[in-house]
């Protein structure tokens, strides 16, 4: 029998015409979005298989990469793309201290791709009226972004809002108040988009975690019979903001 390696396998789901979700072994999700002139992959996952070959099988268009935040499970193998969209502050950090981003690139990476700075309101034109608009939502990282896709009535949130059972803030204990405050401010800033995107498909960076993170429940997810389901949606933004306020006011314990 042929040997199989889960790390090299992908699960591909057609979300809607022109949008595919690609899940890796690490429960990370990335999204291929097509326009008429080019396609954009939002994040990369951590899979070790032939990602560029998979993309070529899904679309005939040239594919660029848009990154929600510079963690390894969202921009691994970014050097395989000719152009990478990344928040302007993250590009500055990468150029100042590249060793801090070593896990985001392959061990054999020899040179960085073209890095295109983005920020609040930036627009990535894919052709045919398909545009990815950038909305900043700090918290998970200082400069996390969400990509809003009006043409497909979808938004790609990475880890900015959370994934089902968790919103992960990475900080030292003495930085907790500052980090939670930044997340609350980011959520408050993002609220202005809610009337526009409330009924869109909210597509997060770890779709399987919307069914819980217990590995015993993962087979339920893949077989389509989950007993737990907490999808990302507009209400989660409001819930997270309320939780931040409760933490900062010590109405809930840290």
Where would I find each of the regions flagged by the language model?
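C-terminal regulatory/interaction regions
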Residues: 235-254
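Short N-terminal helix/helix-N-cap motif within the alpha/beta-hydrolase-1
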Residues: 24, 49-50, 75-77, 142, ...
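Active-site HxH/HxHxD metal-binding segment of metal-dependent hydrolases
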Residues: 46-126, 220-239
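Metallo-beta-lactamase
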Residues: 2-17, 39, 46-47, 83-138, 141-232, ...
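Conserved beta-strand hairpin/beta-sheet module of binuclear metal-dependent hydrolase folds
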Residues: 7-57, 147-163
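Short alpha-helical
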Residues: 28, 49-50, 72-73, 132, ...
